[in-house]
């Protein structure tokens, strides 16, 4: 398997930042009340990861190891500030909905962790791909959790998509469950913890089934007895 495929597999599934490393739980649980909010924060985090990894990798030869962490934080803060201004300019409704969690990307362990563990030691192209894979893995987990909570809580999917994609995206709103009253548990923080636990359990079950399938497909080569070996010769 090539290095690029390994990075994609690690970021999207095997070493998923949300479902394996359990990093960034604060925004994961707080913002995932709707699919739109989850998708918006996930894409913003992905953009920050790609830009940060690219910058750290490009500058890695000129950054003294003694002060590398403050420099990484400055790079991350600069990228996050740029992304925050872009969201404020082009998706103001989403900017208001996400609130403080956009600037809090600076303190997200995923970003500083990938900058230190991978980008500082590898070429620019692979570092950018690593940031993309890790960001998309977190985005997928955020989106699935947000979609589940929105469906169970409000009976809808992609409510408020126009905040992220523009006025045309109002057609994406789907009424799945017709609820007389919203299911508040799904929309509150306890529902987020329960939903995350279900996602973790689901990933574990899938991983175990994949391991069992690989074990069943192994070809057992029979050992030749001495007499059989002589006949073969």
From Swiss-Prot:
Keywords: Cell inner membrane, Cell membrane, Electron transport, Membrane, Translocase, Transmembrane, Transmembrane helix, Transport
Taxonomic superkingdom: Bacteria
GO cellular component: plasma membrane
InterPro entries the UniProt entry points to: NqrDE/RnfAE (IPR003667), RnfE (IPR010968)
Example of a GO biological process term: electron transport chain
Enzyme class: translocase
TM annotation in the entry: 18-38, 39-59, 69-89, 92-112, 128-148, 182-202
Keyword flag Nuclease: no
Primary localisation category: membrane
Membrane topology: Multi-pass membrane protein
Subcellular location: Cell inner membrane
Pfam families found in the cross-reference section: Rnf-Nqr
EC number: 7.-.-.-
Keyword Magnesium applies: no
Entries under NCBIfam families matching the protein: PRK12405.1 (NF009070), rnfE (TIGR01948)
UniProt cross-references to HAMAP family, sorted A to Z: RsxE_RnfE (MF_00478)
Function, in words: Part of a membrane-bound complex that couples electron transfer with translocation of ions across the membrane.
Assembly behavior: The complex is composed of six subunits: RnfA, RnfB, RnfC, RnfD, RnfE and RnfG.
Similarity annotation: Belongs to the NqrDE/RnfAE family.
Protein name listed in UniProt: Ion-translocating oxidoreductase complex subunit E
Organism: Yersinia pseudotuberculosis serotype IB (strain PB1/+)
Gene: rnfE
